[in-house]
A protein has these predicted regions:
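Rossmann-fold scaffold of SDR-type NAD(P)-dependent oxidoreductases
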Residues: 51, 115-123, 145, 168, ...
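N-terminal Rossmann NAD(P)H-binding glycine-rich loop of SDR-like oxidoreductase domains
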Residues: 54, 58-63
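Conserved active-site helix of classical SDR/Rossmann-fold NAD(P)-dependent CH-OH oxidoreductases
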Residues: 63, 149-150, 188-196, 200, ...
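Conserved mid-core segment of classical short-chain dehydrogenase/reductases
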Residues: 84-109, 123-139, 180
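Hydrophobic positions on the long internal alpha-helix
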Residues: 119, 148-156, 160, 194-195
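Catalytic Tyr-X3-Lys loop
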Residues: 131-151, 167, 191
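Catalytic loop of short-chain dehydrogenase/reductase
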Residues: 131-132, 158, 165-205, 215-218, ...
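C-terminal helical subdomain
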Residues: 209, 213-214, 221, 230-276
Length: 276
């Protein structure tokens, strides 16, 4: 009751001893119903899960969807305070154990509701060729990119609404050989294959769902700016561009073909997409 009173007048609230009087007032009843309707509209915009929601791109996605009144769950090694709910993954757990933990937490958070989108932007980078710790780098990249992508796919299979959207994160460089970062290229190529499989008939995803992978060149993140301060930032893709793109496809606007690998290339501060 106090909430409605505060909305009606910034200097007046309804006390509990006046509830009976106001509840029988036609004006109050109309205001009460309108307020409930507004709350329902805001809460029913949609539900999105961001895997990697604490990273730079993930945090940008969480913020963008939250700013547009979406319910957002974040899955990561640490919590994102902007999200509605957080699922913190144990980094020491095995692949199957991580999946089980995430699935149980998602089911509990949703309470029977469905997701409109599952967005996986978890990942990392490690260099190295066949001479330098190849297996170590490949193992790390597999955990960061492939584990998170397959767990996201399983979440989508169980909790995505029909017509929902799944986004994974590949790499434009992994369309070809990556001799100076073999482990990274292997992991991203696996994500590309997963995307094509999820976009095909019989993948196990809900009907009319869309799965794509974004393949950026370089994202404009604080960490990239720290380690490459002299780079041409005009060739880096803004995080807001990706977040807005995800929202558009979540809402069903101008969707690409299912299973598309979407190269994201920025030149002279202009970003263009190409589809494979």
């Amino acid at each position: 009751i106090k909430k409605y009173g505060a909305l009606a007048s910034p200097t007046r609230t309804f006390r509990s001893d006046r509830v009976g009087r106001y509840s029988t007032c036609p004006t109050f009843r109309r205001f009460h119903l309108i307020s409930i309707s507004i709350c329902f509209v805001i809460m029913s915009v949609g539900r999105v899960l961001v895997y990697g929601g604490r990273g730079a791109l993930g945090a940008a996605c969480v913020s963008h969807f939250k700013a547009n009144n979406w319910w957002v769950a974040s899955v990561d090694l640490q919590a994102n305070e902007s999200a509605d709910t957080n699922i913190t993954v144990n980094p020491d757990a095995a692949w199957v154990q991580q999946e089980q933990q995430v699935l149980e937490a998602v089911a509990g958070a949703l309470g029977g509701e469905k997701l409109n989108a599952v967005i996986c932007v978890a990942g990392g980078w490690a260099g190295g060729n066949a001479e330098k710790e190849l297996s170590k780098a490949a193992d790390l990249m597999w955990k960061q990119s492939v584990w998170s992508s397959t767990i996201s796919a399983t979440v989508a299979a169980k909790h995505l609404a029909p017509g929902g959207f799944v986004a994974l994160t590949g790499a434009n460089a992994a369309l070809e050989g990556t001799p100076s970062m073999i482990g990274y290229g292997m992991a991203k190529a696996a994500v590309h294959q997963l995307t094509k499989s999820l976009g095909s008939e019989g993948s196990g995803l809900p009907s009319d769902s869309l799965t794509i992978a974004i393949l950026p060149v370089t994202l404009d993140t604080p960490m990239n700016r720290k380690w490459m301060p002299k780079a041409d930032f005009g060739t880096w893709t803004p995080l807001t561009f990706i977040a807005e793109l995800f929202m558009k496809w979540t809402k069903g606007e101008v969707r690409p073909k299912n299973g598309s690998l979407v190269s994201v290339v920025t030149k002279d501060s202009v970003t263009e997409l190409s589809f494979k």
